[in-house]
Amino acid sequence: MNLHLDVEIETEQISSLRLKATLVKDKSVILFDQEINDRRISITTRIEDVEGWTAETPNLYEIRLELYQDNQFVQGKKFDYGFRQTEIVDGIFLINKKPIKLKGVNRHDFHPVKGWAIDKQTRETDIRIMKSHNINAIRTSHYPNDRHLYELCDRYGLYVIDEADLETHGVRTFLPKDDSRWLDAMIDRGVRMVKRDRNHACVVMWSLGNEAGFAERATIIPVSYTHLAGD
């Protein structure tokens, strides 16, 4: 399976910098270790014998990025990453070439006592309860959730339909529709969601929003499959 990394370095001085990228699970594999002369670096490499990620087998690797200047460590970042492929073939949703049935629920950040102030322990309890009842998918109705939710879904194994914060319930027959005054705001919400969450293996589908009026532009979105609730 191919792994592609886009790295952007925010620094005024670009000289004498070296970037090292490592993939770690049972063993370490160096993906990249070179001097760089640009603030944006693209790395593409082939990974053999990958253990794929699914809700039943949530195999995660750790990617470590290390920045050196004059061979002295400057800064590092690490994050979990799962390898999986999604596609629709003859109307069947496949993950890693195998048909998947989504047995999912809509989930709000809510607690009978704490209200909308959800802490990490409460969120993890939600996920554990869902897994114990054979739920394998979550729709983040009706907004992107805290980053912690996606980390939990990566780790425990739940598929996620990630929903943009776009809803005009009650006035959806005329807002936002094709009103160009709303276009930049709508695009901004979707783009920020995708940029933030695209590296999570659990996210298998993007939702454009919930009950926000179907527009002509939505019929020409150049992606294989989309979700827009209520329209």
Name each model-derived stretch:
Residues Y156-L158, D178-R181:
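Short, hinge-like loop/turn segments at secondary-structure boundaries
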Residues M130, E167, R198-H200:
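Short, flexible turn/loop "capping" segments at secondary-structure junctions
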Residues P144-N145, L166-T168, N210-F214:
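Solvent-exposed loop/turn segments at secondary-structure junctions
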Residues K103-H108, E163-S180, M186, G190, ...:
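Aromatic- and acidic-residue-enriched carbohydrate-binding clefts of CAZyme catalytic domains
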Residues E56, E163, E211:
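Acidic-residue sensor for enzyme active/binding pockets
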Residues H148-L149, H169-R172, A215-R217:
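Extracytoplasmic/secreted cell-surface and envelope-processing proteins
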Residues W182-L228:
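Active-site neighborhood of glycoside hydrolase catalytic domains
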Residues M1-L152, Y156-V160, D188-R189, V204-M205, ...:
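Secreted/periplasmic carbohydrate-active enzymes, especially glycoside hydrolases
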